[in-house]
Regions:
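Short, surface-exposed acidic/glycine-rich loop or hinge patches that mediate macromolecular interfaces
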Residues: 67-68, 125, 210, 235, ...
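ABC transporter nucleotide-binding domain
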Residues: 174-266
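ABC transporter nucleotide-binding domains
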Residues: 3-4, 11-206, 211-212
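C-terminal coupling/interaction segments
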Residues: 267-305
């Protein structure tokens, strides 16, 4: 069963078409990474899922119920964490969760039980200081606790790790990974390492439509390519090798960093023969040669070219 289904969705702002015939399915129980560059339309899509923005065309269903602009019926299934969550800074975490619980009609007993459990989940149990004194990472964790208060079927997180330091990012990702068995998670990001760490499904938004989608393993198997890292003793050697390899049809791209070059090819075995022959003919001896596994980053860079 799909918790979220999007069919032929389109949205324009003036003459600029942001979303173009977008199709997306989020399976129940998945941790779904929604990838795209800044400005690709990820937040616009999420706002339409929440009924906060009206699509020009297409249909959105949450738990098989249609989403209607301006109505909140389907939001009973959704927990939402915006990219910059806002709070009442004079409150403590438990006071804020109590207020949110009362708004959705939970009893005091349930609020107390859930509040303590969720604060423990996000590592804020025992924190008595006011929210205004929280770090950005602590506020993100409190935002997740609030979004989970009503036991949503779908948790939507908009760039939850984008402004955090490495420790804060790890804390958020650990929380999202922990809840994967009870809640479907959809989170948008442009940090590809976060997706590779916890996601089992991925969709790459580019130019308003889904360019690549599926399970992470399927995408890597079908769409990515092998890469070979070659390190030279000098940049002059690298440039000499680069000039010799410039017209090779087996190569689909390369990247340079200092004295290193990463070469991409869909036929790496054949490419390796060409590479080593070129090295021998040019009398070049690299200090390091290593075969690299396909990565989501290399696929992303290939798609957005």
């Amino acid at each position: 069963m799909n918790v979220l289904s999007i069919c032929n969705l389109s949205k324009s702002f003036g003459e600029q078409k942001i979303i173009k015939n977008l199709n997306l399915s989020v399976p129940e129980g998945s941790v779904f990474g929604f990838i795209g560059q800044n400005g690709a339309g990820k937040t616009t899509t999420m706002k339409m899922v929440l009924g906060l923005l009206q699509p020009d065309e297409g249909e959105i269903r949450v738990c098989n119920e249609p989403v209607r602009f301006g109505q909140t019926k389907t939001n009973q299934y959704i927990g939402y964490l915006p990219d910059v969550p806002e709070f009442y800074n004079y409150m403590t975490a438990i006071q804020y969760l109590t207020l949110c619980g009362e708004i959705v009609g939970l009893s005091k007993k349930i609020i107390s039980q859930k509040g303590q459990r969720l604060l423990s989940l996000v590592g804020l149990d025992g924190v008595e200081k006011r929210i205004g004194c929280y770090s950005r990472g602590m506020k993100q964790r409190l935002g997740i606790a609030q979004a989970l208060l009503a036991d949503p079927k779908l948790l939507i997180c908009d760039e939850p790790t984008s402004a955090l330091d490495p420790v804060g990012r790890k804390e958020i990702l650990d929380i999202l990974y922990k809840i994967r068995g009870t809640t479907t998670v959809l989170f948008s990001t442009h940090i590809l390492s976060d997706v590779e760490r916890i996601c089992d499904h991925v969709a790459l938004l580019n130019d308003g439509y889904i360019a690549v989608g599926g399970t992470l393993s399927e995408i890597k198997a079908l769409h990515s390519h092998d890469s070979l890292l070659i390190e030279f003793s000098s940049e002059a050697d690298l440039q000499q090798f680069k000039a010799s390899m410039a017209k090779q049809p087996l190569l689909i791209g390369s990247e340079e960093k200092g004295r290193e070059m990463i070469i991409h090819s869909r036929e790496m075995k054949k490419a390796q023969h060409t590479i080593f022959s070129t090295l021998a003919e040019a009398d070049l001896a690299p200090v390091k040669v290593a075969l690299m596994e396909p990565s989501l980053e290399s696929l992303f860079l290939e798609v957005i070219k």
